[in-house]
Design a protein with these regions (language model features):
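An N-terminal assembly and electron-transfer interface module characteristic of large anaerobic redox
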Residues: 11-15, 19, 91-98, 170, ...
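Structural motif corresponding to the early beta-alpha repeats
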Residues: 115-256, 268, 318, 381-382
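Catalytic domains of carbohydrate-active enzymes, especially glycoside hydrolases
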Residues: 96-115, 175
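Asp-box/BNR beta-propeller blade signature and adjacent active/binding-site loops
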Residues: 37, 42-50, 89-96, 105-106, ...
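Histidine-acidic metal/acid-base catalytic patches
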Residues: 2-15, 19-25, 29-40, 45-85, ...
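Short, acidic/polar
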Residues: 51-53, 90-104, 162-169, 325-331
Length: 430
């Protein structure tokens, strides 16, 4: 077939070629990926569609200290397909755990975090966990520790619980796990969560929080209320009998006692602790004040025992929920080497501490690129978790529903990871 090019077409083609400049690759650096000297994107071991099991990141709804802040409970997750639909010929049948790992790896994610087993942790069991993930091509970089409510509340038996925490941390150090994350709640304010819908994105789900929320009959909520409480605003809910009410002074006293025993042992073990903020950062939660619901509280925490082992989980979403600029807050803690883990998400705030919406990572008030640049600037090299995916029909139709109202599943995590990687690559190149 003959092709006719007019003189004008030839001139236009030549001009476009000149504007295009050198061919791709001539002097243009390739984007950088996660490495030893960069932040590392991670997911929880249960984030890829299967059940969480013992290796997930979820926590029981309701009682304070047993919950894993920042990571949704398992929700309703589908079983793995054996072999995965559309997989290459010869792909073997997979266990649910193998299928999860395969999906995580397909997003280019090589690091995972998980909830830990019952304390005290055993070196052999931890090594098995790490070796299992390694066999999937994944590195376990963070475990959530819990099971020390007496230490949190200052009750009898706290010394025995702290002994078990210390034993667990030494086991972690022996297997080379770098970070242990934990919470310090008198009560986690999950009763204030509800689902909102993004009208612009045609019904995608957000997670709303309202300090004055009254539960509406017939709607699903993360926490169940008694009949007597069902007409009360969240802020007026009474303390639970097994938790009691606690002041800031009481909570600071219990965590100070904990840190002065635990941090020296963490230093010996070569392990960093990361305390997650109180999320939601409500001023009072069922009668108890919250020590990690303010930036001032975060700053006080790292001064109790001055050590890189005594750090925080920097959550830019919670930072904004409290009305602060996460870029400035990241700079404060990163410059002091006190960020031991990062949660990366976005929100819109109507009233700091009391009324906000957890939205898609690309549409909130946070400048996520500026946050990432600040982390890179201060040479943060540990994990970044793009948590709290939003609800999408694709996940809803497949039963992949996050444990938070308005939370999503694997498809939404793919969006979170892709956006986070774009921010990271741009920050590394800037």
């Amino acid at each position: 077939m003959s092709v006719y090019l007019s003189r004008r077409t030839m001139i236009q083609t030549a001009g476009l070629a000149a504007l295009a400049g050198p061919m791709s690759g001539a002097g243009t650096p390739e984007p950088r990926f996660e490495g030893k000297d960069t932040p590392k994107i991670c997911l929880a071991t249960g984030d890829a569609g299967g059940g969480f099991g013992s290796g997930g990141r979820g926590g029981a709804p309701g009682g304070a200290a047993a919950q894993s802040a920042g990571a949704a409970p398992a929700g309703n997750q589908p079983p793995a397909q054996n072999p995965p639909a559309g997989a290459a010929p010869g792909t073997p049948a997979l266990s649910p755990q193998e299928a999860n790992a395969r999906r995580i790896k397909q997003l280019g994610v090589n690091y995972v975090l998980s909830g830990g087993p019952r304390i005290p942790w055993d070196e052999t069991a931890l090594k098995t966990m790490m070796d299992t993930q390694k066999s999937y091509g994944l590195t376990l970089g963070n475990l959530m520790i819990q099971g020390f409510n007496n230490a949190i509340y200052g009750h009898q038996g706290r010394d025995e619980e702290i002994d078990r925490v210390i034993q667990s941390i030494h086991a972690v150090g022996k297997v080379g796990l770098p970070v242990v994350e934990y919470n310090w709640y008198a009560h986690r304010a999950t009763e204030g969560y509800f689902e909102e819908f993004d009208d612009v994105r045609t019904g995608a789900g957000w997670t709303g929080f309202d300090y004055e929320l009254v539960h509406t009959p017939g709607r699903a909520y993360m926490a169940r209320l008694s009949d007597a409480e069902s007409t009360m605003k969240f802020k007026d809910l009474p303390p639970l009998a097994n938790e009691g009410a606690h002041t800031l002074d009481e909570m600071w006293a219990t965590i100070t006692y904990f840190l002065k025993r635990v941090i020296p042992e963490a230093e010996k073990a070569g392990v960093r602790l990361a305390l997650h903020p109180n999320d939601p950062p409500a001023p009072v939660s069922r009668g108890s004040q919250q020590i990690m619901s303010s930036v001032e509280g975060w700053k006080h925490l790292i001064e109790i025992v001055r050590s890189p082992a005594n750090g925080i989980t920097f959550d830019c979403g919670v930072t904004r929920e409290m009305g602060h600029n996460p870029v400035e807050v990241a700079a404060y803690f990163a410059s002091r080497d006190r960020i031991n883990h990062v949660h990366f998400r976005n929100v819109r705030v109507k009233k700091p501490y009391e009324r906000y919406s957890e939205v898609f990572i690309d549409e909130g008030e946070n400048n996520m690129f500026a946050v990432m640049k600040e982390l890179v600037k201060h040479k943060y090299t540990r994990l970044i978790y793009p948590e709290h995916p939003r609800a999408l029909d694709y996940d809803r139709e497949r039963g992949r529903i996050g444990g938070y109202p308005g939370g999503g599943g694997y498809a939404s995590f793919a969006f979170q990871v892709g956006y986070t990687r774009a921010m990271l690559q741009a920050a590394l190149a800037s």
